[in-house]
Amino acid sequence: MDQRRTCPWALRSDGDGRSASLLCLLLASLSWSASSSTSFSTFHSEHRDWTFNHLTVHQSTGAVYVGAINRVYKLSGNLTILVAHKTGPEEDNKSCYPPLIVQPCSEVLTLTNNVNKLLIIDYSENRLLACGSLYQGVCKLLRLDDLFILVEPSHKKEHYLSSVNKTGTMYGVIVRSEGEDGKLFIGTAVDGKQDYFPTLSSRKLPRDPESSAMLDYELHSDFVSSLIKIPSDTLALISHFDIFYIYGFASGNFVYFLTVQPETPEGVSNSASDLFYTSRIVRLCKDDPKFHSYVSLPFGCVRGDTEYRLLQAAYLSKPGDVLAKSLNITAQEDVLFAIFSKGQKQYHQPPDDSALCVFPIRAVNAQIKDRLQSCYQGEGNLELNWLLGKDVQCTKAPVPIDDNFCGLDINQPLGGSVPVDGVTLFTSSRDRMTSVASYIYNGYSVVFVGTKNGKVKKIRADGPPHGGIQYEMVTVFKDGSPVLRDMAFSIDHKFLYVMSERQVSRVPVESCEQYTTCAECLSSGDPHCGWCTLHHTCSPRDSCERADEPHRFADSIGQCMSIMVQPSSISVSQHSLPLSLLVSDAPDLAAGVTCLFGNLTEVEGQVVGSRVVCVSPAARDVPAIPVDQDWFGVVLQLKSQETGRTFVSTEFKFYNCSAHQLCLSCVNSAFRCHWCKYRNLCTHDPTTCSFQEGRINISEDCPQLFPTEEILIPVGEVKPITLKARNLPQPQSGQRGYECVLNIQGVIHRVPALRFNSSSVQCQNSSYLYDGMDISNLAVDFAVVWNGNFVIDNPEDVKVHLYKCAAQRESCGLCLKADPKFECGWCSGEGRCTLRPHCSPQPWLDWSSRNVKCSNPRISETAEGCKALPGAFPQQSCSWAVSAAAKSDTAVRRE
């Protein structure tokens, strides 16, 4: 059976002709992992220990290439697996040099994983360069289509890049001039094997994969070579010294590498934990095989008093119009986005406090040019101790230094101590930022930042003074795995490929659909998002039909459509009324509009310019107003007959004036309600009032009681109650007069009342009772009515207070402590608290009397700790300690 028919995507596993059947079974079991969640397509590692290392996307085909431990994968754009190429494990030993694939090795061999350390697409030759950690770091050139091995150069020492088996320490840049063989600039950590591996080199990359010159140094002689090695003296000084290559790129005539390395000051500690690290930007001319153009400067950024110097990741991009303007550069220039952690220690376990910074390449080059000019003027030293081993004085030479200066055989290699400081855009004190990628959308620089906890921050880089604005954060890896350094966009820039050690996810660059209103959409800060008006959706412009027509696509919040209805509410008794809807910022509605009143009814709208006329619901469709409410709201929507989608809405209210039983609540309602004074009725139609003078629509004209002095009525006393009022109506023919209604302990008492004029009414003489002697003062709900049940408003809640002098005042002292407003006194002869008229000609005491002294005072309690003296009267021996409560009970008043 043809293996490729049953497993067509398992094209090739390795170059030794072994059967692909095992690989086919492996891939069949793996294919389920390229699954899709709610938002993301994902691809998972086939073995827990075979973690992912590198990722790149072909900018023409959209194929995704993933370098992992023991595998290189080719995936489709939606992360389904196409090819898996085996790179390990193999029998090896790091001490075998040359590796055993060249000559036998006496060291003990073990099955060793192959860590992918470099994955670069060589576009012009349609091949993939994949370099690993096996066999001292040999590389393979793989055909892009099927990952077939084109060549695996391994027979010369130039073919061994580095045996370091830690990913993220090597970076390569391919430079190719049209019609010529390419060059591979490569920087790598060497793990102390400086004799075997250069830390930086440029190598030949012939078009012919079988060329014997493949990966040879561009220039190599006894005196000059296209390489830099770490001196043994530096390793003797700092045994842990190495240079980690984080990122690299070509821009203009130069190649740049971004590195992190230990500092090498005199007297430095040899402990790895005590090392200070410096992030540096290294520049070489593309056409400088002698490396005379080597310049290395420290770089980082600062916010406030905090320095960010530990490089985590970087990405070369364009600034876009907005960021370019703030940086005073053009939108076509290159800028470098970089992530730094705080400080300069613990590079391998960096602090969570991190920063996103931007460096215009123009500014980097300008600072390098200044450094070159000062050195060629003989100022200072070369400042590259790790490489030169000592301070070397700059040599003065009358050499013009222009923007493309590539060095001479003097004043090289050149270092520096003054850092290139970038512009800090965004900082985060938690969840350290670990990766960065950027692209331009609609003039904005949109930056995507991965974090230690598996999230991606979306940041709009506006530049000074606003910096970077985080407008969204997406959880990509639910297990909280860190986002690795490599991120890449799909060729249409609609997706971002994000990688952790065990998962690759395809994340949409925008999630505009999450915003359901125009205001939410256009205040989100996401430059991708605009409001597609007639589709009533938040989307990118290119997803909105006819977006270029006026008002079809809103990209600022001031362009959101709004609707104003006249009238904005109607009474439940009004039916089929024409409503005028003014729609602002509306597109052409000539295709037709439908009016929807909630789920009540749907009617055709008449479009007249920028207005739409809708007819309100018929009587059968008018909603019922809930009890205890005077209105009910429905959503009035306009639906486009072109798109079938509602595109603008507002609340429309149906109100019921008759829900109001009092004049003040009627005229103070939110609606056009009127009070018919002589009908005691609230209505939306004032013409229904009996008399013109009976129509009220302002609170000042409502009949209402005014507060007066407190109304105090002793129980059993026959007294009138006189009240102040305003606008009291004169009962008309056939209408009954006024009454006062008191609710005394649940019993309604109606008392005839006399209206003196429009501002005064009096409840006629009457007496009132309430039950119980445990209540001395009872506030009674009170109302003035006329014509039986027409209630006069009582906005200040005027009450009648009934009281009993004797209630809870059994002693003389308690009686005399009663509030003077009640006019209670102690009737000594009868031994009770009462009003004076009810006390027979006996001594009657109240607080206004002179020399008041209750007879036979009693001490009911004494202060704690008071002790009567033996043989003494208590009131004499402890009168000074009588408690406040006892004084109240006895009410002793002494001269």
Describe the role of every protein-language-model region:
Residues 9-33, 634-636:
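Cleavable N-terminal signal peptides of Sec/SRP-targeted secreted and luminal proteins
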Residues 21-123, 127-130, 135-138, 194:
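Signal-peptide-cleavage-adjacent N-terminal segments of secreted and extracellular proteins
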Residues 38-73, 111-125, 166-181, 185, ...:
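Beta-strand-rich domains and repeat architectures in extracellular enzymes and scaffolds
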Residues 55, 64, 72, 119, ...:
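Structural signal for hydrophobic/aromatic residues that build the beta-strand cores
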Residues 471-483, 562-586, 592-660, 700-733, ...:
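Beta-rich interaction modules in large eukaryotic scaffold/regulatory proteins
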Residues 512-526, 657-672, 806-821:
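Disulfide-braced loops of extracellular cysteine-rich modules
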